[in-house]
């Protein structure tokens, strides 16, 4: 059994890791770390976990017996705590944005904080699971993608790879539920402000914009810029990303659907919807699926892609476990076979 530790145990990402890893046949949750709740029983913070008798612990580097540690923490915590663990030889999967952006200047411009050391950035492997493989011996630090980038990159990757788009035309209109903001209180997520309301935010300067651009540029082999506008909607979970992109070759809905279906034929967590149907966030709730609907406006040769995920599962903890499975050469679906919760 692989001994796993979870850092940031009082947050939503960590709680999803605990929920999902309980069904993983090759994993035991050895330690749950939270610096603010040391020695408190887990069930005190999360009463729905009454059946789990573990207590929160303080993270230590010396004598740490974990094979893998998941970090579901803010980026500053990850930047400080992860390098010593990696140096010790422990595999780390980081759910924060600390190691995603390889250019330190760009990171600091968007995150408004000092970037990680360049050596740490160079060693971190950014992993959208559907196109990644690892060397178990050589890979020590995996940088889990953000939620918006996951939904967006999975939809765009086939089109960019096949070089069938005008790279200057990418527009991403994305909606997210409130859990994406974490458990910290703020006026923006106060019930009276959020309920029966819809708002755009971080226009032009969202932290996920450079992440999307960086990895689209890698796929394209040239610099790619996008227009990305996120919106906050009054629901708990879910991301719906509607992507508009001009096609540089003549495609119909049928031919683009065929390309996308072929591209993801062997990827169990990406479901290309039938022509004429488009996914909703409820249809992936609580699951590791990304559902994608496709339409081509032949008059303007514009592809419209609708991509949905659960931001806490495929957009965070589920993909982190998927990366664990790849790292240890398990079946990619191990511990992640949950059907969406419906209704």
Swiss-Prot record:
One of its GO terms (molecular function) is NAD binding. Its main location: cytoplasm. The keyword Nucleotide-binding does not apply. GO terms for biological process: L-arginine biosynthetic process. The keyword Cell membrane does not apply. Pathway: Amino-acid biosynthesis; L-arginine biosynthesis; N(2)-acetyl-L-ornithine from L-glutamate: step 3/4. PROSITE patterns: ARGC. It comes from Staphylococcus aureus (strain NCTC 8325 / PS 47). Belongs to the NAGSA dehydrogenase family. Type 1 subfamily. Pfam families: Semialdhyde_dh, Semialdhyde_dhC_1. The active site is at 147. It is found in: Cytoplasm. Its EC number is 1.2.1.38. Catalyzes the NADPH-dependent reduction of N-acetyl-5-glutamyl phosphate to yield N-acetyl-L-glutamate 5-semialdehyde. SUPFAM superfamilies: Glyceraldehyde-3-phosphate dehydrogenase-like, C-terminal domain (SSF55347), NAD(P)-binding Rossmann-fold domains (SSF51735). This is N-acetyl-gamma-glutamyl-phosphate reductase.
């Amino acid at each position: 059994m692989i001994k796993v530790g979870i850092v940031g145990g009082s947050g939503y990402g960590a709680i999803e890791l605990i929920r999902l890893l309980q069904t993983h046949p090759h994993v035991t949750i050895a330690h749950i770390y939270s610096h603010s709740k040391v020695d408190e029983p887990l069930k005190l913070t999360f009463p729905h976990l009454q059946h789990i008798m573990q207590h929160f612990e303080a993270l230590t580097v010396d004598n740490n017996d974990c094979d893998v540690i998941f970090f579901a923490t803010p980026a500053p915590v990850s930047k400080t705590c992860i390098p010593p663990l990696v140096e010790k030889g422990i595999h780390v999967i980081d759910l924060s944005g600390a190691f995603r952006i390889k250019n330190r200047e760009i990171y600091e411009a968007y995150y408004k904080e000092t970037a990680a050391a360049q050596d740490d950035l160079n060693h971190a492997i950014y992993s959208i699971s559907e196109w990644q493989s690892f060397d178990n011996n050589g890979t020590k630090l995996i940088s889990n993608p953000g939620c918006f980038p996951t939904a967006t990159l999975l939809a765009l990757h086939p089109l960019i790879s096949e070089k069938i788009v005008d790279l200057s035309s990418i527009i991403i209109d994305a909606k997210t539920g409130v859990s994406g903001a974490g458990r910290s209180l703020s006026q923006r997520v106060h019930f009276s402000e959020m309920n029966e309301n819809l708002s755009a935010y971080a226009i032009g300067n969202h932290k996920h914009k450079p992440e999307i651009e960086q990895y689209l540029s890698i796929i394209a082999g040239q610099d790619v810029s996008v227009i990305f506008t996120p919106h906050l909607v009054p629901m708990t979970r879910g991301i719906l990303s509607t992507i508009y992109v001009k096609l540089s070759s003549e495609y119909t809905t049928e031919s683009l659907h065929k390309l996308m279906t072929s591209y993801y034929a062997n990827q169990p967590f990406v479901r290309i919807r039938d022509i004429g149907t488009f996914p909703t966030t409820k249809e992936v709730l609580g699951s590791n699926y990304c559902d994608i609907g496709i339409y081509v406006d032949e008059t303007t040769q514009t592809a419209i892609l609708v991509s949905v995920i659960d931001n806490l599962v495929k957009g965070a903890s589920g993909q982190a476990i998927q990366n664990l499975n790849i790292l240890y050469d398990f079946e990619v679906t191990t511990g992640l076979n949950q059907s969406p919760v419906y209704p």
